[in-house]
Amino acid sequence: ASDEDREGEAIAWHLYEVLKLKPENTKRIVFHEITKSAILKAIEQPRDIDINLVNAQQARRILDRIVGFELSPVLWRKVKPALSAGRLQSVAVRLIVEREREIHAFKSEAAYRVTAVFLVPDTDGKLVEMKAELAHRIKTKKEAEAFLNACKGANFAIEDITTRPLKKTPPAPFTTSTLQQEAARKLGYTVAQTMMIAQRLYESGFITYMRTDSVNLSEFATIGSKDAIIKMMGERYVHPRHFETKTKGAQEAHEAIRPTYMENQSIEGTAQEKKLYDLIWKRTIASQMADAELEKTTVTISISSSSEVFTAIGEVIKFDGFLRVYRESYDDENEQEDESNLLPPLKKGQKLEHGPIVATERFTQRPPRYTEASLVRKLEELGIGRPSTYAPTISTIQNREYVEKGNKDGEERMFNVLTLKDQQVKDENHTEITGTEKAKLFPTDTGTVVNDFLTEYFPDILDYNFTASVEKEFDEIAEGEVKWTSILKTFYDQFHPSVENTLAIKTEHKVGERILGEEPETGKPVSVKIGRFGPMAQIGTAEDEEKPRFAQMKKGQSIETITLEEVLELFKLPRTLGEYEGKTVSVGIGRFGPYVLHNKVYVSLPKTMDPMEITLEEAEQLILEKRTKEAERHIRVQ
């Protein structure tokens, strides 16, 4: 009675083999929820072990082992020891490396967004503000100034009003992927955390099996949802519906992730378990609720002195439907629909009085770095991996230090604002912080170098279509359409010679090494590369009479972007700051970042301090702070 998926089927088969069971008295039962009724029903419907599912799992496991066992030694020889490669993890790293390069190559373009405030009488005759925006952006400051000047003394009138009904349909119940994404966005859980909590909920009998790519709900679940909706909100909110699974190569016909009993709106458990259960319950209930009914009004405002038009949009919820229970979140704020406010009463031809008209310089946005949730979504879109592989893949690439999850401080940027008020155009410059990122996935230098090496020598393994087509072949094995051994043989016969050829290639420079120039004083070559403890800089070569000098790179510096000047700065460390308590105080950079060294004690530098600029007084303060902390720790222990 192991889990109802390929891994579960393989476990059942291994038990059958190891225990030497007989086919005539061994039956397999499956259920996707741990409830009395589900288990009794499964016992009434036993079946044999599905050898096709077992073979599909064997094929995946063996193919992934072949890739790992064959590629990892190549990386040890060509890049650095102790590295590993894997079919899914390498493709995930490639996505992150490519996105990083897109970001660095991105050139932001400026344009002016023009907004206006119009003063309109409401039903009581009181003037209220109505915000409107120019239908398109203006490219240059000169054109924006010309437009605002044209608005001086112009007449504004309502040219057209269109009102149309809108419907919003609820999202489908959760699959593994959508649960991981929504739990990250709404609850801040990592992908691995979500799966761990969901596993506990499943084992406690609160939810159905949590590794699934199906959006189907059983009849039992739809009836349970209907009853719960009627009881809580009334008949009008019910709309039973069936969702189609759209995922590429969706696996066996599981059910979506849902509560086992829809009448249980809450459960006993930890705070995290309660939050995740609440999310699953709301999503499931919402999927069986009526559409939200809205009314969208678009008002077009003409300008007597220009062919341009302003547009004001109002959206009113006429019937909340599923929105009463659930609103879906988005990775990118731009994906969210603009929920505008209610517009005042208006009529075609109505003359309008304007308040300030503002042209604000805005910039095109670079592609965002992946979060764990958006990476899962991308892998699913490409048909790479399966519900059981998303979380382990994302954990592996971080554990291997090919990718790190981190925050990025924003940068200050100046932007221009032109304001037409009281027939005068005011020109001002403002500053804003842009590009702040939290919990995003960044490629490390090691990840980038490994990715480039594998992309050059093993393009098939890193190819998105190839990886997705392998998943399709596993599906065909599961359906009994192809032999698993023939797929493995075909793959190995093509893959193994590539490994042999790559090992035989001799290269002049170490993989990932970048020559930046020469040291001015000695003329020796200056390079950066991946060393045993990560990215490092080097002056000189092993062939020189004098040993080469090495320096650890600072956190935030990258092999791809570091300059010769920045590398030469690194060799000014360690530097002596002076003496404290009769002992030398120096500052340097080690494998864990910048440090102060005093009397054989290392003190890490805070992120805000630059090792090139720290003073002796500041270093003394850090030494004293560390001593105080150590003393407090010893007191607490005693």
Task: Give the location of each predicted region.
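Conserved short loop/turn motifs at secondary-structure junctions
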Residues: 1-4, 80-84, 163-172, 182-187, ...
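Metal- or metallocofactor-binding catalytic centers and their adjacent structured scaffolds
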Residues: 138-173, 347-353, 360, 465, ...
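Phosphate-backbone binding and catalysis cores of DNA-processing enzymes
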Residues: 1-165, 255-308, 314-318, 474, ...
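Basic, low-complexity terminal or inter-domain segments flanking catalytic cores
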Residues: 72, 105, 144, 191-192, ...
